[in-house]
Amino acid sequence: MLDHFNRKENASTGNLIIQGEQGCGKTMLATSFIKVLQKDGEQLTGKMGKIDAAALNKKDVQQVVRKITGGCLIIERAGDIDRSIAAKLSFLMEHDITGTLYILEDTSKGIKKALSMDEGFASKFTEKISVPIFTNDELVLFAKSYSAELGYKIDEMAILALHNRISNIERIDQATTLTEVKDIIDEAIDREAHSGLKKAISILTAKRYTDDDRIVLKEDHFREK
């Protein structure tokens, strides 16, 4: 990856593949990764753009690349990319000397399909991150982190309720995803915001907030409908 930025010749190497099951957090991972590079200030100096491969097929690829010059282009559901678009993008990458980073996102099957569209295109994606299947404890840690980013804290009893919610959506043939956990948190936040009388009482008794002014999510907010 560092070679991609150090060479400054073109975007013919060091581009990234992020693969994993649907809803596993590929886009969140890619976005966080790009923010780190942008914060450093020396690698990515341009804008970040995200586009679905099916939508990219209908665009002027050169114009899309021009908009994110020196930044990053994330192509979601990369397996839907057309052969002609992959070839055009490969050509543009060979002549891109601005340090632009290109990221493909999809399941392993989708990535394999995308790379089969054009040999030159495939050769430019030399780095890969495979998003793992998360345990329930890891999903809860994600939920706590996601809540904190939004200004909330999950109390101890609510953590138990969250564990139950996650267990209840487990499937034998498919791992529980970060997207599903995110939806549970979003639902809890919505319930907290519309809890009426209980909310008014908690505000008056100062039980709604932590010492660092985060809103507390309680057990009731995680109960299934």
Walk through the language-model features, giving the residues of each.
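Pre-Walker A (pre-P-loop) alpha-helix and adjacent loop at the N terminus of AAA/AAA+ ATPase modules
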Residues: 1-14
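Walker A/P-loop
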Residues: 13-45
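Conserved nucleotide-binding/hydrolysis micro-motifs of P-loop NTPases
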Residues: 24, 55-57, 79-81, 107-112, ...
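AAA+/P-loop NTPase substrate/partner-engagement loops
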Residues: 36-68
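Conserved P-loop NTPase "ATPase switch" module shared by AAA+ and STAND
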Residues: 52-55, 65-85, 94
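Structural recognition of the conserved hydrophobic beta-strand(s) that form the central parallel beta-sheet
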Residues: 74-76, 100-108
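A short helix-turn-beta junction within AAA+ P-loop NTPase domains corresponding to the substrate/partner-engaging
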Residues: 116-133
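C-terminal alpha-helical "lid" subdomain
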Residues: 146-153, 160-225
